[in-house]
Amino acid sequence: MKFLVVDDFSTMRRIVRGLLKELGFLNVEEAEDGVVALNRLKSEPFDFVVSDWNMPNMTGLELLKAIRADAALAHLPVLMVTAEAKKENIIEAAKSGASGYVVKPFTAATLDEKLNKIFKATGAKEAA
């Protein structure tokens, strides 16, 4: 399973990559914003997107909406990762088609729980 981790903060990308590795997911690529991510998604196959909310150029929410609007990408599970625990953000993400939502900071166990819920809902594999 190939993941794309999208975050403008390189340390956060490394943290998420490390947590995914801890969970057995070794095929992880990175993008620093939504524009780069969308270009990568359109040019190479990915199975799962983990995206930050607040980024320059194209926010995570804008990326999510672009993914859902593209017939070739609309099936991709998207887990939104953010420091924003505001109810309205969670509702907005859900309305826009987010597969899940996790608030920073989080542990490998929390990430595992969120991923497994999404895998169960989408019928995707739970192993790398």
Feature annotation, model-predicted:
Residues 39, 61-74:
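Short amphipathic alpha-helix used as the core "switch/output" element in two-component signaling
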Residues 17-18, 62, 85-100:
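Alpha4 helix (beta4-alpha4-beta5 surface) of REC/receiver domains from two-component response regulators
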Residues 55:
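Receiver (REC) domain active-site loop signature in two-component systems and cognate sites
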Residues 10-29:
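Two-component/phosphorelay signaling modules centered on CheY-like receiver
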Residues 44-50:
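Active-site beta3 strand of CheY-like receiver
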Residues 30-39, 60:
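Helix N-cap/capping motif at the beta->alpha junctions
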Residues 106-115:
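C-terminal output helix
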